[in-house]
């Protein structure tokens, strides 16, 4: 029943998902109307925040501005495809707990067991689903500004490292990490 209910207002376009022929998952996070007052009246422009991912560890976000919504979305999708970063995943979840932030937005992400699902809100959910995380517990604190939440989430995910990468950095084997 909840799925059948139509969303109203600005939530209507939030987290809209499309799969394009290149296999990338595109999610529209937010569309905003901006007004500039000039001598002849108001000029309206639109901004779009989108997230693009391959569902297997790559994710990027883009922010586009234009006089019309479709053009703003297209610009932001192009920018998102140019800004892809790699994320180390562990069977559909994270390797370890992640805390990060951008501006006043703070994010906390924790690995979860199989069957948990993506427990995250708003802009964080779009990023986590696009990158291919299937099970995670996440919480946003501080500012809920979608742009800063997306930036903080991508920054935290890209800083996360697998045990194999940490061991290679230290010149050790993975088995030696916990023992000394």
UniProtKB/Swiss-Prot annotation:
Keyword annotations of the record: Ribonucleoprotein, Ribosomal protein, RNA-binding, rRNA-binding
One of the record's GO cellular component terms: small ribosomal subunit
Residues in S5 DRBM domain copies: 24-87
NCBIfam families cross-referenced by the UniProt entry: rpsE_bact
Subunit field text: Part of the 30S ribosomal subunit. Contacts proteins S4 and S8.
Role description: With S4 and S12 plays an important role in translational accuracy.
Family: Belongs to the universal ribosomal protein uS5 family.
Protein name: Small ribosomal subunit protein uS5
